[in-house]
């Protein structure tokens, strides 16, 4: 009976909390509408004009972001939004779509945006300041709980803050509502709740 069965693509939005303590979680589908990835010698190449989200999902996303009453917006996708250098799946494989995404954030200016991603077998936190956005955007990448790329010790990411985590890990967001504006503690943790990376963000 899920309404997702009535649409193309598995994207959805969910709002939690009430009043001035609302969190909107937006889950994007980065596979259903995506054009095939381009490879040369096994390495993904930028597709400058390729479709990524599909127009219906773009329209829906703009609607969810425009005049949203939420104080924090958590936007998740299976692949990384911000990192550009890594050679695997990422939004940067579709540069036009990546620009469009950050331009949409700058246009709608939703408060408290935090990006979530995975599918890398590493953990890291990235930060990026899009043109026209009043504050920098942070992305938490965490994966995985059962497998980790322990050999990955020096992957380039000009946007990374803190270390790369090449051990089993999970991501955690803690929201502090006691301040005039919400403060979010972004963390990557591991076994026995060990904290590998922690970054406090105010909006």
Name the predicted role of every residue range.
Residues 1-203:
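Long, structured stretches of catalytic cores involved in phosphate-ester chemistry, encompassing
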């Amino acid at each position: 009976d899920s309404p997702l069965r009535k649409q193309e693509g598995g994207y959805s939005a969910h709002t939690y909390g009430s009043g001035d303590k609302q969190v909107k979680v937006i889950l994007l589908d980065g596979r259903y509408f995506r054009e095939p990835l381009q490879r040369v010698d096994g390495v993904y190449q930028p597709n400058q004009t390729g479709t990524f989200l599909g127009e219906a999902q773009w329209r829906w996303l703009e609607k969810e972001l425009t005049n949203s009453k939420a104080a924090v917006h958590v936007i998740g996708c299976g692949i990384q939004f911000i990192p550009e250098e890594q050679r695997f799946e990422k939004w940067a494989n579709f540069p036009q779509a990546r620009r469009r995404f950050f331009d949409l954030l700058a246009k709608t200016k939703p408060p408290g945006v935090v990006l979530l991603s995975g599918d890398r077998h590493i953990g890291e936190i990235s930060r990026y300041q899009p043109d026209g956005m009043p504050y920098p955007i942070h992305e938490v990448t965490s994966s995985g709980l059962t497998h980790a790329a322990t050999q990955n010790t020096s992957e380039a990411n000009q946007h990374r803050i803190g270390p790369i985590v090449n051990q089993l890990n999970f991501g955690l967001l803690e929201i502090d509502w006691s301040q005039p504006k919400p403060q979010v503690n972004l963390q990557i943790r591991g076994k026995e709740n060990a904290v590998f990376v922690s970054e406090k963000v105010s909006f």
